[in-house]
Amino acid sequence: MAKKRPSKPGYGALFKAAKSASNLLVLFIPSQARDEQPINQDHWRDEALTALGKLFGGATAYPKGKGVWRDDDQGGKLLFDEPIVVQCYTSEEAIRRQAGALREFLVWMGTECRQGAVGFVIDRDYLEIRFPLTRKGG
């Protein structure tokens, strides 16, 4: 039978930190809509920072990257994008407690920005909320 290691104190205790959060939440703020029309990315970056600040105590946005998303509803069309990455550290308890409000924000952003999906990451899990393809005039 293997010996059980004694538990180590967490880094929060080690550094006498006022806050310790070990769950990573990452959002992607798109630069364009599904129809490749630009969106007001700075507005949505600020909305995301505000939402994560209120829900989880803070967040950081990183400059534009380069990305691609395959839109299967449009026959596998590749949509290239320059997303802003927003991340925050929080607790599992806070994520569970604020899940409804976070989902509400993500659906709002995805709808208003005319996205095919809104992707986000919690720790190692990539999650995606999809939106149906809407045709102009229909």
Provide a role label for each language-model segment.
Residues 2-138:
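Positively charged, small/polar-rich N-terminal and surface patches that mediate targeting and assembly
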